[in-house]
Amino acid sequence: SLVGSEMCIRDRTNEMIKSNIEQGLTTLGIEFGSTRIKAVLINTDHEPIAVGAYDWENSLIDGIWTYSEEEIWAGLQGCYKNLVEEVKAKYGVTITKLAGLGFSAMMHGYLAFDEKDTLLVPFRTWRNNITGQASHELIKLFNYNVPQRFSIAHLYQAILNNEEHVNKIKFFTTLAGFVHWKLSGEKVLGIGDASGMFPIDINTKDYNEKMLADFDAHIADKNYPWSIREILPKVLVAGENAGYLTAEGAKLLDPTGTLQAGTPMCPPEGDAGTGMVATNTVTKRTGNVSAGTSVFAMIVLERDLSKVYEELDMVTTPAGDLVAMAHSNNCTTDLNSWISLFHECLTSFGVKVDANELFSTLYNKALEGDADCGGLLAYCYHSGEHITGFTEGRPLFVRKSDSKFNLANFIRVHLSTALGAMKTGLDILTKEENVTIEQILGHGGLFKTKGVGQTIMANAIGAPVTVMETAGEGGAWGIALLADYMNNKENLSLDEYLSTKVFKNSVAETIAPTKEGIEGFETFMTRYRNGLAIEQSAIDNLK
């Protein structure tokens, strides 16, 4: 019978996975997100075979967003234990050894240590907006965009504040770098995560020498006993070995002592880099867009930009190619509020409608609208928007009396404006720097309704947008793939390895833009830029 043969295949697959685990052929990736720590175990075919998770929250202590050291280790152990339990339940075996191991985490922030390896001040995460002066001065000093969350901005702000601990610093790093160091003894960092600490020279695949020298000269009068290069982690690129799991490290990960030491470890990475790996967008001229509550686009560049743009953050792929990131705080929140208003309206008439059906029907309605949204204008600014220069926001909908005001255009304008700020950032790349974008991969809530967000996005960017059938397991899977790449790269570059070994059979749907769609979106964007004064007036006058 068919069912019998399916069960037979499943049993055979399970037996293969079981022997993979018992022989120590599986690879583990763990990523520390801002609300969840996630572990993904992959088999020799790069497929996730088990996951573990641990939920955690940052705390606001003395005005600083932080996680305690105890929480970091409790979270790591809890997440690993959860994975081990799933492996036991699914396959009836216990993990004793691994083929490879990798850690990733939210980027940036500040973890500083003294000569006794003691944490000098509580971990300052990327969420802290406390380094405004440092960021401003470093942009001038380096002629390079240094956002507030970059580690060097945190260090320089501590210097500007004359904080006592700065004199005692022996080493500072990111969260992924910290966990990796404690498990391997190695003070290293993957280049993607390192690019969120200090600017990178993409030719040498290391920190920018001139900027290191400029920084030391700039703070010379402080007479600190360190130079900046001495206290930064060593930069490694994808595929390089970054050390081995030590006996103490194995105990930190698995306090039961079941996991053996000696596993090779890949360079620890940041969540931007692992996201690029998990979406197969590390190739030049490609990028990915994550669109949900907020939206960000990451585009892999072929060369340095001609000048500094504060709207764009510069990071790198795990292989060390330059990436421009346009991040916008606001995306789908306002549209969700409107859809919930329509839901309330239907409920008032006693109509029961499923939320997914409501979203899908209204999103699809947008495709019937005019390419330029019929002259309508909206801003989805629930909060401030740095790309367009707003420190706070007011969601806003406005039209002329002769605009084509109908449901299709109404939904379409709210979908289009959700990408307006991000498009402003991308226009700098495509129009002022002549960057070519050939392919975009979309993921996140905006793409949940098939074909709609994708169509609007393709017209906004002017490039085909692909959405994969499975969203994958995100960054934890990405760092597991990087650990596997270290062991099995042969002579392949990272993008070749991903395309030929990992994603060769992945199912995806691509939508290309149309000439009419691109022109319509440009017309909408002219209206969007011209109307920013209306948004400003709403902020000034609606208190």
Predicted regions and their residues:
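Short beta-strand-loop/turn "lid" adjacent to the catalytic site in phosphate-handling enzymes
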Residues: 88-125, 145-147, 180-192, 196-201, ...
